[in-house]
A protein has these predicted regions:
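A short acidic/basic microdomain associated with nuclease active sites
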Residues: 98-114
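Active-site ExK catalytic segment of metal-dependent nucleases
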Residues: 133-159
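A short, highly charged nucleic-acid-interacting micro-segment common to nuclease
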Residues: 70-89
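Extended, charged low-complexity segments
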Residues: 221-279
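A short, glycine/Asx- and small/polar-enriched loop/turn
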Residues: 115-119
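Acidic, metal/cofactor-coordinating or nucleic-acid-engaging core segments within structured domains
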Residues: 150-228
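Conserved catalytic cores of phosphodiester-cleaving nucleases, focusing on short active-site segments
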Residues: 94, 121-124, 134-141
Length: 279
């Protein structure tokens, strides 16, 4: 059995929203930047391909598909700001921590009129025998945590407006792969005839915020002092987020992910992307 990659330093589920303080960990006296990049790229085919394309991956076509994926990312309008990288990180975290299933391929989120789902950085589901829970993700891949909080709360408030939500549900429904095993259940949930009250009762928003952490840069291994200090940092940020959010109609799972520096992680991700493009 494959062990989890991410270290959950702190998990507080007795507050709203709940808190997950997540860390990539350390190895050989260094923050596990390179290991994180390798792990994220394990998810890249699943993140970028439709369900049907992913299911058809074979030893014969996988290299061609990887080239297709990397070309799609480079052509994305989000690439200049590395938005795709934050979305990939969110994808990996919620897949690992909550065993979510991706419902939509992010690379197929077009920016043209009538087919935009800019509002959601991830569209996943959690499936049980009786229910299908919709996970609509938001991520701010930032170096400044307080700027991240300010920007994400502005978007969260926009994304629960009725007209906005209905438009986004239409865009999502149009991109659900008919071969995906849960397609019918999700389309029924998002149908205009389904009350938004019922939809919202089965919907949560995972929010991922990254930031350059002064605590993280002080340590080169996981120790009691690091756990205590980073936990205090997580708790302080969580309180700031909660105070600014106020009352909110949907369940939120807040994921905080400290970085040594955002720029060095972005450079490593881009280098890996270029290597994959040359395969």
């Amino acid at each position: 059995m494959r062990p989890p990659f991410f270290n959950i330093i702190i998990h507080k589920d007795d507050t709203f929203p709940d808190l997950h303080g997540v860390c990539a960990g350390f190895e050989s006296r260094q923050w596990r930047k390179d290991q994180l990049v390798d792990y994220l790229f394990e998810y890249l085919p699943e993140f970028a391909l439709t369900y049907s394309e992913f299911e058809k991956l074979t030893g014969e076509n996988v290299v061609a598909k990887i080239r297709q994926i990397t070309a799609s990312i480079y052509q994305s309008e989000k690439f200049e700001n590395r938005g795709e990288f934050g979305e990939l990180l969110l994808h990996a975290i919620i897949r690992e921590t909550y065993n979510t299933l991706p419902a939509i391929s992010k690379i197929y989120y077009k920016d043209g009129p009538n087919e935009t789902v800019k509002g959601f950085d991830a569209v996943h589901v959690v499936v049980t025998d009786d229910t299908l829970e919709l996970w609509l993700g938001e991520v701010k891949f930032y170096n400044n945590i307080y700027k991240a909080i300010s920007d994400v709360i502005e978007e969260l408030n926009l994304h629960v407006e009725v007209r906005y939500v209905r438009n986004e549900f239409v865009a999502i429904t149009n991109k659900i792969d008919a071969q995906w095993p849960h397609a019918d259940r999700l389309m029924t949930l998002l149908h205009p005839h389904t009350s938004l009250d019922d939809v919202f009762s089965k919907t949560c928003i995972p929010v991922l915020l990254t930031y350059d952490s002064s605590v993280l840069t002080k340590y080169d291994k996981k120790c009691d002092e690091y756990i205590q200090e980073i936990s205090e940092e997580f708790t302080k940020i969580h309180k700031n987020f909660c105070d600014k959010l106020g009352v909110f109609p949907l369940t939120i799972h807040l994921f905080l992910f400290p970085l040594n520096t955002k720029i060095e992680l972005m450079n490593s991700l881009e280098s890996k992307l270029k290597i994959w493009q040359r395969l």
